[in-house]
Structure formats: C-alpha cells, structure tokens
C-alpha cells in the first residue's frame, strides 16, 4: 500500500470564485472561446493552489475548477460513451432547470485520448516542490449504476462480465499510465454509487433497473480491483465515497453496513475518503 502525503487530507473540491462562474456562463452563451475560459480557469487554479499550500495542505488539487459535472466531463471522452443533450424540465414551482445529461455506452469502451494530462500538467506546474498534486477522476462504476444494463449497448456487450468491465478497466489503466508518465503519483476516484447503495431509496431504484443491491457492491469491488491492478508502480489510488451534493444538500443517507464488506475487505485501494 502506498502512503498518503500526510495524516490529514481533503477531497479536493472547492467553491468556484465569482469571476470563474461568470466566465463559464459567458462560454455557455458563446461570448468567449474555450481558450479564453481556460485562461480564467488557470488563474483560479493558481489562486486555489496557493490557498491550499498557505493553510498547510500537502496534497494539492485544482479545486476541480475545470469540471462541469464530476463524472461526465471525464467519461464522455472515452471511446464508446455518448452523452445525450441536456433537456429543460419544469419544476413543481413552475421554474425551469436543465436536467443532468444521460450517459450511455453505445460501443466498445476504449481510451482514445489522454483525458486529464493537460490539466495535471498545469496543476503540477503550480504546486510547490515537496507537495503532491492530486488528480480526481470519476469511479468506473459511474458507467453502470445510473443506467444499469439498459444504459449499455447489448450489441457491443451481449454480456457485461467480463468484457465490459475489462474494457473499462483497460481504458482507465491507459489513463493512469499517461498521468504517471507525466509525474502523477496520487489519483482519487470519486464514487457516489457505493454510498447510494447504503440508502434504501437508491437500493429500490437499483432493483427497478433489474440489479440486486446486495450483489452490486461485490461486483463493483471486483470492477474497481481491475483498475487497481493496472495502476503504475508508486501511484497512490484512493476513493472518495460521495453521498451527492447539490447546494449543500446530500442525495443519499444511511450507514455503510450494506457495502462495508465489499468496501473494506474486498477492495485493494490505498485510501478511502468516507462521508458521514
């Protein structure tokens, strides 16, 4: 097991400064280019790196300032994954909002580009020597849990086990190796699904999709271990179990008992960040 940089650590997500929120809105309206937005993101990341170092943190993130969604930004760049265009829904109070886009696996999953490399290189350039830049990516289980079997092409994957899980793990392995080649030694996978499987409402939703919520944690442990088996030597691979967060409101509750065996006995990860 690889050791954490210090006895204290953090998940890595920070509130975006107002000027970055405004720039993202301008980009969405077509008022600025992606290149102009990236320069604003660079400024915000430089500032949040300094903040983390000033308070004494040893693992340093980019605040996740380049993300729109914690999972889609990454997974949508894998070959074989398609994200539907978000639709506007009307809420009970009459207001409208964009529903989160839906991801589907439409072909064989594969690594077609280095997804986080440029982001990591900028982060690394800002981190003081002696501190450790940390990269956060979504858990591979995000490609299965939300849509279940119906969200994965039967033409590409008549059976999920083992081909689907192997293909996703291989794609993740390629990404981890590209990061390691650039000097990354610390990667965190963000996973909502194991925490969701502690909540009876979410467990019932899994049943409705045709999955067994008692079996899923063990299947996901084996799935995640396929990724862990491909991590480069010297890389720390952690998992953040997130209960969901929207305007400081969690999406799932419940103790960890339904997933504890799979989480703590079966998975081969180096560290966990667990929300209570």
Per-region residue spans from a language model:
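Domain-level signal for soluble alpha/beta catalytic cores
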Residues: 1-276
